[in-house]
């Protein structure tokens, strides 16, 4: 099976078009105002209209309250909710039940011990995403161009699909897939020319490299 690819932090039609044309499986929209990739619900609603039905539209949230989720989900047609904050298993389950959408819980890791944090989420999330721990003092929980030791994931199984993120680029994604065994990868800053500005050539190169990176 080819590696699945998620292009996250899309803010304009050009990036959306390229991601779709090159066969991205997931496109991510960020609903977190401190991020340079943040989009308003109305803007996001416009962007998802460019994505065909077989492309999974993902909304990234950081410790969202119900009001935030209500505002976005009444305007934007999303298929998957990505929770990238400190949401507890109880909160993940509550969001999943309230909104009737699958949830991908992000876990920030730097070493093998951090993987133990996945256990409480296995019964309440639909998918996991392993991202690098943000640098100390960082405002953003992800999209920081920081990676981690991919070998800590080698041979690991959780009973849920999982995705790899954290400092991935066209130059290293094939190796990351080979070492970690990831069946899906997520990129944001690694396909940008500046924070929040996606680079079409980098998107193309990333997807091509990711798809060639798994035996």
Curated annotation (Swiss-Prot):
GO terms for biological process: L-tryptophan biosynthetic process. Pathway: Amino-acid biosynthesis; L-tryptophan biosynthesis; L-tryptophan from chorismate: step 3/5. InterPro entries: Aldolase_TIM, PRAI_dom, RibuloseP-bd_barrel, TrpF_fam. It catalyses: N-(5-phospho-beta-D-ribosyl)anthranilate = 1-(2-carboxyphenylamino)-1-deoxy-D-ribulose 5-phosphate. Its EC number is 5.3.1.24. Belongs to the TrpF family. This is N-(5'-phosphoribosyl)anthranilate isomerase.
């Amino acid at each position: 099976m080819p590696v699945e690819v998620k292009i996250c932090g899309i803010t304009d039609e050009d990036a959306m078009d390229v991601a779709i044309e090159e066969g991205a499986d997931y496109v991510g929209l960020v609903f977190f105002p401190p991020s340079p990739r943040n989009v308003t619900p109305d803007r996001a609603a416009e962007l998802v209209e460019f994505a065909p039905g077989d492309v999974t539209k993902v909304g990234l949230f950081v410790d969202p309250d119900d009001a935030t989720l209500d505002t976005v989900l009444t305007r934007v047609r999303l298929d998957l909710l990505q929770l990238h904050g400190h949401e507890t298993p109880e909160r993940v389950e509550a969001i999943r039940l309230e909104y009737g959408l699958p949830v991908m819980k992000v876990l920030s890791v730097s070493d093998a011990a951090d993987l133990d944090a996945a256990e409480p989420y296995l019964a309440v999330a639909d998918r996991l995403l392993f991202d690098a721990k943000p640098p100390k003092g960082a405002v953003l929980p992800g999209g920081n161009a920081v990676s981690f030791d991919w070998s800590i994931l080698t041979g690991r199984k959780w009973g849920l699909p999982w995705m790899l993120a954290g400092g991935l680029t066209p130059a290293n994604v094939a190796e990351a897939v080979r070492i970690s065994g990831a069946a899906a990868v997520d990129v944001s800053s690694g396909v940008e020319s500046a924070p929040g500005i996606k680079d079409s050539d980098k998107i193309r190169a990333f997807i091509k490299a990711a798809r060639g990176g798994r035996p």
